Amino acid sequence: MDTKGTDKGTISIAFVHEALVCLRETGIDERQMLLRAGISPELLAAPQARVSSSHYGLLWHSIAQRLDDEFFGLDSHRMKAGSFTMLCHSLIHTDTLERALRRALRFFRLVLDDFHGELEIEDGVARIRLKDRSDPVSGEAVLPKRAFAYGTYLVVLHGLSCWLVGR
């Protein structure tokens, strides 16, 4: 993909690298997954490279199906394939974005264990605060394996919000 044009509709290769970590950890051939998604493996060596959002989406879907985890192994509890579809079905008829976000956050709290989000609204500004699970013995926060977990969570919520508002 041309890296000199506009960035609109593209994803940094850094996110591709992050998505591939779970494949490397499980010994799955990442090259085959990249090719299946229409992403040249050679782009991994180009730090400024970008891929189309549709190709990244194909990679995301392929990895989720292969691992049976739509959260890429980023939580101690996998988010089984089909969970996201069920989430969308549960949100499609909500009448406000606030209700949809609250329902989505409850859903994620059911399927993920390591952290959760809480919607806070103050002076017309909405914010999602992420809270890590605490260890039951020490009381200390149990942090996700990688910061990519937080980003993935927020990207999914943002994407859902855009989809719902666009309907």
What are these regions (language model features)?
Residues H116, E120-R167:
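DNA-contacting interfaces and partner/effector-binding or oligomerization modules
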Residues M1-R133:
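N-terminal low-complexity or simple alpha-helical regulatory segments
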